[in-house]
Amino acid sequence: MSSDTSLSESSLLKEESGSLTKSRPPIKSNPVRENIKSFVAGGVGGVCAVFTGHPFDLIKVRCQNGQANSTVHAITNIIKEAKTQVKGTLFTNSVKGFYKGVIPPLLGVTPIFAVSFWGYDVGKKLVTFNNKQGGSNELTMGQMAAAGFISAIPTTLVTAPTERVKVVLQTSSKGSFIQAAKTIVKEGGIASLFKGSLATLARDGPGSALYFASYEISKNYLNSRQPRQDAGKDEPVNILNVCLAGGIAGMSMWLAVFPIDTIKTKLQASSTRQNMLSATKEIYLQRGGIKGFFPGLGPALLRSFPANAATFLGVEMTHSLFKKYGI
């Protein structure tokens, strides 16, 4: 009797436990949390990019703005400026010289890269909105490119004023980020901070399309050449593949959009009102034709590989840590 009772109680408990397990709804991802994760990961990637690539970017900007006629000339000028400093050693002053104007990208890097990677995630959702349920989750090359282009639209609102101040700092003797921003606003109003926005979007729209698509394609190809993990196990981040794919993405983008970046830099460094057409004509006539649109290409490409390798490594490792610690 007691044995039957205990058995029935045991089976009842098992049934209740089973029914509770079956009725428990699956844990859904929190959109707000996912957005925050995208912002944080993008910001980490951006900080990595700035510290890796800023010296190359400084040289590129000086070549594009006509302050140096070659990479060697730009480097020589920076070292000469360091020699004129009274305080500090030549080495420390040279390091400071190569990181001149680093504050604007550092201040703007978190929102720029956060918005960019968040925008890419939003873009992926938009381009796959009409996909059939149960179909493949993999994006086509066209969908990747479209999502990348979409990411550039909100990013331009942050990128344009930040790069405007950065270019002014790198090409003049304005003391600090705040001082340069104040001078720009004083001379031309708030709208002056957004000078070159159209050129920025013209660069970053197709540039981001190529950037994200080439990264995804390169990473997927490189990963496909590696032995697969056991089913059900999360694959660790392959640092080499991520860095190679990130470097390829950066170089592909800069090769494609470099002439537009030269026009943008010319517009943002100018103290007079110009449009893209007049800036293009001026560059063509004064800098020897087509080659005038490619000054500083060497340092830009030298910068793009390590900087973008660092960007995507920072993003991927941050997402990996989020997953590892259940964030």
Swiss-Prot record:
It comes from Saccharomyces cerevisiae (strain ATCC 204508 / S288c). Transports carnitine, acetylcarnitine, propionylcarnitine and to a much lower extent medium- and long-chain acylcarnitines. It holds the Pfam family Mito_carr. This is Mitochondrial carnitine carrier. The keyword Transmembrane helix applies. It is found in: Mitochondrion inner membrane. Gene3D superfamilies: Mitochondrial carrier domain (1.50.40.10). The chain crosses the membrane at residues 33-49, 107-123, 141-162, 196-212, 244-260, 293-313.
